[in-house]
Design a protein with these regions (language model features):
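Active-site phosphate-binding and catalytic loops of NTP-dependent enzymes
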Residues: 36-39, 59-66, 81-92, 134-151, ...
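Conserved lysine of the Walker
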Residues: 222
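NTP-binding/hydrolysis catalytic cores, primarily Walker-type P-loop NTPases
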Residues: 364-437
Length: 437
């Protein structure tokens, strides 16, 4: 049975069906020899368990059609080998997020929009068991003393779970999935996330080793754009990546990846992003890429950008480039309370060359809304100038967002730096307007 039918067919998810499935699952665990199965090859194990479940179904003498029998067998196999009811969602390549709010309320994001599915867990205990299965696979734990967990599945998907007492109404689970292949800049142009001219500009900035900070809200496409831009880093450079949960997929050969680590049961042993940024400086990087700056590590990232690690990239949660500046100032202040505001702004202005703002719109589309140059300091204020903007002009009856990508006519000051790197951009690039109809 295809995952589409299993995902959206609400018939058959009756309490009686769920009870039958769990009765069979319990009996299966009592009957099979797990030790003997562990020595078998994967496909043979599935065959043995499939046969055992089929015998149990027959013994129950429950009137099931062949389709229903196949379905219950597949779902029990999902319980044994996979993540139970989540398996059909994980097999669906169009699903980007899986959001479990209650055992009976499971949503997916597809194409930037949320849809309720027919997927259900039996109860809180069933959902909690799947959460524990997920986190145990990656060496994490979740319990009353540690009720929050961030983890990464083997396929790179990012998992966040919360259980009582912090989750008031029962366990919560969110899975952020990533496509099988990382999107390239050209793919983003095809999806109308930006124009070809905007991509040419960003590509030139990466090659000329400008420091770029990508801003946006949750789910706006920051990591997707970061992945795409990183593909333009020359192959002969050494790149060090630092993330909370490794999700960047760089295509270059010489990439050193590091990931934070939470505290152990005793509350010790945590490794934070700031420690990894400091450590990265000792690893002879040509460029440092931080998945996201959230706190004190912002100071170390800026200092790295200012001390010979040009061409570094990172992301930050912010709604506009100016908001991104404000957040950076706060983060640097957290790292060094003795640093005056003017000194902080001088650090930021000398380190960051470019802000790229991304946003998700009501129709699910994601677009680059600003490409903004950091010009420098005027008295105590950091000056910015927009090079490209996306302007929303309306919404169709079907809900599609209309607008235009518009060059502001300003030729950025960093064009001289691009020229010094052997990169020239046509003057008309900074005069273009592209309508999204």
């Amino acid at each position: 049975m295809g995952w589409v039918n299993r995902l959206f067919n609400r018939e058959g998810n009756t309490p009686e069906y769920q009870e039958l499935k769990f009765t069979l699952h319990r009996k299966l665990l009592d009957r099979i020899n797990l030790e003997a199965l562990s020595s078998m090859a994967g496909e043979r194990v599935r065959t043995e368990i499939r046969s055992a479940v089929a015998r149990l179904v027959d013994e129950e003498k429950t009137p099931l059609s062949l389709v229903e029998k196949d379905r219950v067998i597949e779902e029990i196999l999902d319980e044994v080998f996979g993540l139970g009811p989540l398996e059909p969602l994980l097999q669906d390549p169009t699903v980007s997020d899986i959001l479990v709010t209650t055992p009976k309320l499971v949503y997916v994001e597809r194409g930037g929009k949320l849809y309720r599915t027919s997927v259900e867990f039996k109860d809180d205990a069933h959902l909690l068991r799947i959460i524990e299965k997920i986190v145990s696979r990656v060496g994490r734990r979740v319990d009353e003393s540690s009720p929050l967990v961030d983890a990464r599945l083997p396929d790179g998907s990012r998992v966040n779970a919360a259980i009582p007492p912090v989750a008031v109404d029962g366990p919560l689970l969110s899975i952020r999935r990533f496509g099988r292949y990382a999107l390239k800049g050209e793919d983003l142009v095809a999806k109308l996330a930006l124009t070809e001219g905007m991509l040419d500009l960003l590509k030139a900035c990466v090659k000329a080793r400008l420091n770029i900070l990508i801003c946006g809200g949750t789910g706006s496409g920051k990591t997707t754009l970061l992945n795409a831009l990183s593909s333009y880093i020359p192959e002969d450079e050494r790149i060090v990546t630092i993330e909370d949960a490794a999700e960047l997929r760089l295509q270059q050969t010489h990439v050193a990846r590091m990931e934070t680590r939470p505290a152990n049961v005793e509350g010790t042993g945590a490794i934070h992003i700031r420690q990894l940024v400091i450590n990265a400086l000792r690893m002879r990087p040509d460029r440092i890429i931080v998945g996201e700056v959230r706190a004190e590590e912002a100071l170390d990232m800026l200092q790295a950008m200012n001390t010979g690690h040009d061409g570094s990239l990172t992301t930050i949660h912010a709604n506009t480039p100016r908001d991104g500046l404000g957040r950076l100032e706060v983060m640097v202040g957290m790292a060094n309370a003795n640093m005056g505001l003017r000194s902080i702004r001088q650090q930021v202005a000398s380190a960051v060359n470019l802000f790229v703002q991304v946003a998700r719109f009501s129709d699910g589309s994601r677009r680059v809304t600003h490409i903004t140059e950091v010009v420098g300091m005027e008295q105590d204020i950091i000056t910015l100038q927009d090079v490209f903007l996306f302007e929303k002009t309306g919404i169709t009856e079907s809900g599609r967002v209309l607008g235009r990508f518009r060059a502001t006519g300003i030729r950025p000051r960093f064009c001289e730096r691009l020229k010094a790197s052997g990169i020239s951009l046509p003057p008309q690039l900074f005069q273009t307007v592209v309508e999204i109809n």
